[in-house]
């Protein structure tokens, strides 16, 4: 049976895992790393880069490097490269395509299905965008599950005792808190809260602004206006943040960061953990609001939580850990890898769906209330937040005016009393209502939330039986046609990437063939080898060198094949000469070794390890 992968599609980094027997295993990518930077870049020659290689060139190519695209999921944001505009779904699909390809290489089989995680506080539009990204990448997304829930699944799979846990998930761009009850193989979310605009990126930004302000005061130059300098500053800020989790002081040294009339200027700053904590104190405090909200919604006190799980790389920040410790009055649980646990949970859920893991039931909730706009601009809730999903709820409404023959259903998500202050998910019209006094027609509005947290709405005139149904498509969602077009483009880009890689391999092989051929010619000197064989190799080297100067890859390949053939003949001649010269000595040695009384003797051989 084909494997289903679990993917944590993160703001900063992404991770892939798969079930290996009864245990989830994180898969290394092509570079040998367990996490892949969620970075996409386009070179000036049109090549697409994803992951570590894209992140590495960001300083020299800031305008064409895309980071933290997850923060724009479900919005109308576009990335403009040359004459093309890419949606967040398309950029995310490029990341997913790499994760998929690397997993296929590691597992040695084709991957077509996945479970992808999203922040618990993602809206319907953001969830739909994530699912679309998976589709564009050539994946059937079996389930969209919440990151904290996935983490709890990975933590609690082998835990037999009943317990109540709180997952504190602070990632690169989002923050979630979920409270779950675990017991008897059931994982039930009872409350969730969060902030989709709070994460490690914001902590980095505080360091960037602090350093840029100090530099501007000293040199009169605002580094934030220089894209290359700003990218260097961002990378240095992220590095400093990470270092300050294990040391109390770090140095930020950026030579030649800018130029003045007097010449180059450098940045050499020291940042202490105390200063970093001062710069980010309000961000740490901002995590406490959703934490209190989740506890309030669950009707619990901090002391009633058995374990607090820290998830997401940003929970390594000491001030964050201290805030959690102080709030709950206990040490947070650190027995899980905060970077990998979400992907591992997704892999477990994938195995549950496929039937490979049994006796596990996952009950998640909707993070925000859902409803429609009614008379006076009021937001009327049909499904309250923290309702277990999947769920279905219906309510009867009527017309607001005499003789009204159609109604507009304005679907919203949020917690405010007035519709104008909540997020619009979509609108649709139910028409063909027979004219009648207001309040007489009966219109049944039904909300249906599936296991992915995606909303389906229907409106039915009970008098005529006429019904209108929609799966919510926000204004930022991609249409079926747009998704199909994006899939074709993604496939074309994948083919182009493969072609470029193959071309690079052909050129590398040609270069290596020339090097080895020239080395072989030197080795053949003075060995009495037929000069015509040496001349043949020399004659075959030049066409390869000439072909490498051009763009015709087939010419390079053909020239390399001819060189390889000539090298083979020369190598055979050298081998024959060397072999015949050593025949006599070898025979004598064999005789000596074979002499004696016919007894054999065991010998112990030690292999010298050249790497040591």
From Swiss-Prot:
Task: List where Gly residues composition bias occurs.
Answer: 581-597
Q: GO MF terms on file? A: ATP binding; ATP-dependent protein folding chaperone; unfolded protein binding
Q: One Pfam family for this entry, by name?
A: HSP70
Disordered as annotated region, ranges: 579-612
What keyword terms does UniProt attach to this protein? ATP-binding, Chaperone, Nucleotide-binding, Phosphoprotein, Stress response
PROSITE patterns assigned: HSP70_1, HSP70_2, HSP70_3
Residue positions, PTM Phosphothreonine: 174
Q: Where is the composition biased (Basic and acidic residues)?
A: 603-612
The answer to whether UniProt assigns keyword Chaperone to this entry is yes
Q: Which domain of life is it from?
A: Bacteria
Instruction: Return the CDD domains for the record.
Output: ASKHA_NBD_HSP70_DnaK-like
Q: What InterPro entries does this protein map onto? A: ATPase_NBD, Chaperone_DnaK, Heat_shock_70_CS, HSP70_C_sf, HSP70_peptide-bd_sf, Hsp_70_fam
Q: What induces it?
A: By stress conditions e.g. heat shock.
Q: Which family does it belong to?
A: Belongs to the heat shock protein 70 family.
Q: What does this protein do?
A: Acts as a chaperone.
- What is the name listed in the Swiss-Prot or TrEMBL entry for this protein? Chaperone protein DnaK
Source organism (scientific name): Symbiobacterium thermophilum (strain DSM 24528 / JCM 14929 / IAM 14863 / T)
Gene (UniProt): dnaK
């Amino acid at each position: 049976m084909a494997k289903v992968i679990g993917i944590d599609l993160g703001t900063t980094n992404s991770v892939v895992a798969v079930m290996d027997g009864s245990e989830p295993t994180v898969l290394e990518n092509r570079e040998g790393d367990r996490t892949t930077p969620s970075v996409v870049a386009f070179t000036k020659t049109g090549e697409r880069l994803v992951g570590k290689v894209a992140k590495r060139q960001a300083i020299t190519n800031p305008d064409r490097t895309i980071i933290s695209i997850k923060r724009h999921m479900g919005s109308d944001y576009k990335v403009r490269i040359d004459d093309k505009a890419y949606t967040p779904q398309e950029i995310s699909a490029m990341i997913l395509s790499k994760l998929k390809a690397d997993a296929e290489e590691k597992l040695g089989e084709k991957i077509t299905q996945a479970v992808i995680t999203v922040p618990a506080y993602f809206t319907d539009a953001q969830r739909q965008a994530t699912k679309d990204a998976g589709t564009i990448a050539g994946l059937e997304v079996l389930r969209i599950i919440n990151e904290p829930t996935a983490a709890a699944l990975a933590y609690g799979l082998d835990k037999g005792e009943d317990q109540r846990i709180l997952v504190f998930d602070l990632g690169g761009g989002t923050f979630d808190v979920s409270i779950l009850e675990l017991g008897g193989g059931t994982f039930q979310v009872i409350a969730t809260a969060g902030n989709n605009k709070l994460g490690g990126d914001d902590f980095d930004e505080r360091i960037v602004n602090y350093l840029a302000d100090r530099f501007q005061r000293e040199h009169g130059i605002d580094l934030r206006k220089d894209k290359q300098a700003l990218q260097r500053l961002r990378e240095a800020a992220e590095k400093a943040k990470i270092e300050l989790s294990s040391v109390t002081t770090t140095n930020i040294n950026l030579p030649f960061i800018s130029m003045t009339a007097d010449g180059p200027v450098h940045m050499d700053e020291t940042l202490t953990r105390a200063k970093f904590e001062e710069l980010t104190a309000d961000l740490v405090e901002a995590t406490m609001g959703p934490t209190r909200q989740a506890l309030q919604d669950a009707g619990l006190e901090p002391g009633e939580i058995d374990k607090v799980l820290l998830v997401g790389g940003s929970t390594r920040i000491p001030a964050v850990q201290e805030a959690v410790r102080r709030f709950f009055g206990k040490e947070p649980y650190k027995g899980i890898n905060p970077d990998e646990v979400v992907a591992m949970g997704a892999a477990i859920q994938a195995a549950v769906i496929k039937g490979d893991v049994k006796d596990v039931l996952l009950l998640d909730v909707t993070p925000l209330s859902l409803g429609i706009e009614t008379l006076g601009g009021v937001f009327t809730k049909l499904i309250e937040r923290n309702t277990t999903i999947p769920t279905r709820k219906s309510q009867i409404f009527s017309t607001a005016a005499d003789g009204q023959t159609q109604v507009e259903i304005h679907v919203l998500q949020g917690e405010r009393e007035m519709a104008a202050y909540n997020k619009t998910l979509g609108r649709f019209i139910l028409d063909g209502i027979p004219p009648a006094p207001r309040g007489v027609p009966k219109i049944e509005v039904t909300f249906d939330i599936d296991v992915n947290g995606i909303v389906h709405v229907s409106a039915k005139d009970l008098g005529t039986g006429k019904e209108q149904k929609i799966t919510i498509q926000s204004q930022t969602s991609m249409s079926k046609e747009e998704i199909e077009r994006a899939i074709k483009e993604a496939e074309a880009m994948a083919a182009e990437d493969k072609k470029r890689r193959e071309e690079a391999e052909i050129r590398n092989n040609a270069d290596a063939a020339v090097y080895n051929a020239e080395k072989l010619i030197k080795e053949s000197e003075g060995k009495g080898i037929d000069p015509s064989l040496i001349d043949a190799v020399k004659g075959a080297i030049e066409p390869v060198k000439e072909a490498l100067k051009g763009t015709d890859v087939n010419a390079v390949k053909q020239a390399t094949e001819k060189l390889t053939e000539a090298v083979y003949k020369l190598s055979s001649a050298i081998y024959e000469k060397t072999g015949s010269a050593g025949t006599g000595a070898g025979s004598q040695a064999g005789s000596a070794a074979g002499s004696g009384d016919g007894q054999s003797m065991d010998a112990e051989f030690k292999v010298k390890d050249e790497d040591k």
